[in-house]
Amino acid sequence: DLADLDALLGPRTRWVAMTHASNVLGTLNDVRAVADRVHAAGARLAVDGVAYAPHRLPDVAASGADVYVFSFYKVFGPHYAVMAVERELLLSLPGLNHFFIAQDDMPYKLQPGNVNFELSYGAAGIPDYLDAAAAHHGLSGSVREQRQAAVGLFAAQEDALSQHLLDYLRGKRGVRVIGRDCV
């Protein structure tokens, strides 16, 4: 509830961290609404998208998040992660590397070791997979629209399966489903 957030924000608030979606219930949180409130309070917002990205295509810019993270292995890729950070914030972060690596020497200042090239290359297959799914289903529009629509097809299938499960559970004697009455 956003009113609960408003009660927690104050002049000493510097950061708010949240999930984009519940890993347990799949509840989707309105990141943009939270970002607007957090920024109005003079704080920054970090969003964990690990439970959202496998089911919807994140739009980090539209979300208003200052930091957005998720794991590629959750979206058909290797065991690797991505962290999207607005540039000015990224430049202000202290480096993890040697002292002689400049603060603006990106991405090296945040790489305490060598990049795993195999994993990096493996992540390049994710857009190919989404493009193949879009082509298979004859989806049209811009590349982003096609990928969004492909992920939307995945989500629709998941929702149908989840609804089937919820309907089954609600019909079982001795089972009580607690939470929102939707998928």
Segments the model singles out, each with a brief description of its role:
Residues D1-V183:
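Pyridoxal 5′-phosphate
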